[in-house]
Amino acid sequence: MGVYHADALVIRSREYGESDRLLTLFSREYGKIQAVAKGVRKPKSRQRAGAQLFTYAEYLLHKGKSLDTVNQVSPRESFPHLWTDLDMSMAATAMAELLDLATLPGQPHPELFTLTFSSLFLVESCDPALVQCTYALKLMNYLGYRPRLVECAECGQRVQGERLLFSPDAGGVVCRQCQTQGSSPAVGRWVSGGSLGLMRQLLQGELEKLNRLRWNQWSKKEILEVSQYFCEQTLDKSLRSWSMGNRLVNVGQNPSGKDDLNERRDVDGTGES
C-alpha cells in the first residue's frame, strides 16, 4: 500500500521540524495513523486546515516506514463550536487524549470512531462533562474493561449503600464486607450511591438520550474524578487534560455540608477517610 485514502479525525497535532506538523489521525478503516503534514505551518499552506485539532477530513496519505505523509487533504468538518466554549474544548481534548492513549496504530476500531465523532457533536447540546464521562465509560467497555457497577466485583452480590468503594483493580465497586477481607484490602475511591446510579445510566444508555439526564455539581466532580481514576489505573497512563479539566470544575458542597475536597481521598479499604 503506497498511497491510500482515509477519512479521519485529527486527535493530536503538534509541531514537527521547522514548518511541519505531526498528526495523530483516527480513521474508521485503519484506526490510528501517525502522519507528517509538511509545510502546514507556513501561512500560505493549502493543507493548513487539515492539520488543526478535531478536523475531520479526507486524507490522501503516502505509506512510510515509521511515519506516513499527508499528500492531500479535503476538510469536511471542523467542529467550530469546540473553539467557542472552554468546557466543550476541554471535554473534546480529554476524549481525544483518552482515545490516543487507549489505542495502537493500525488497529481499526470502527465503533470507537463512531463514538468519538458523535461525542464531538454532542458536547454542543449536552453538558460537556456528562458527554466526557459517558465517552470514557463506553470506550473502556468497548476495549473489554466494563466496570461492574451493579454487583460487587469481588463476591457478585448486589451492592447497596450511600457510599461504596470503586476499585479499578477489582473491576468495579466493592461491597463493605469484601473491602477488608483477605490479606490485601481493596484499594480505590469512594463514590456516592447517586453518582453510581448515574454512572450506570451513562454506561448503558444511548448517546442520543444524554440530554435527558441531570446531575448536580457534586455528582459532576465525583464522576469526573472516578472516571479519570478508572481509566488511568486500568490503562496505567496519566490523563493530563482530564486533570486540567477537573480543576476547572467548581466545587460545591455535598448534602451533609462538608467540603467536597475533604471527602475526595484515596482509601486503602480499611476506612472511609
Swiss-Prot record:
List keywords of the entry alphabetically.
DNA damage, DNA recombination, DNA repair
One Pfam family cited in the UniProt record for this chain = RecO_C
Q: Where is this region: Disordered?
A: 250-273
| One cellular-component annotation, GO | bacterial nucleoid
The record's section on InterPro entries has: ARFGAP/RecO (IPR037278), DNA_rep/recomb_RecO_N (IPR022572), NA-bd_OB-fold (IPR012340), RecO (IPR003717), RecO_C (IPR042242)
Segments of skewed composition (Basic and acidic residues)? 257-273
Family membership noted in the UniProt record: Belongs to the RecO family.
Q: What is this protein called?
A: DNA repair protein RecO
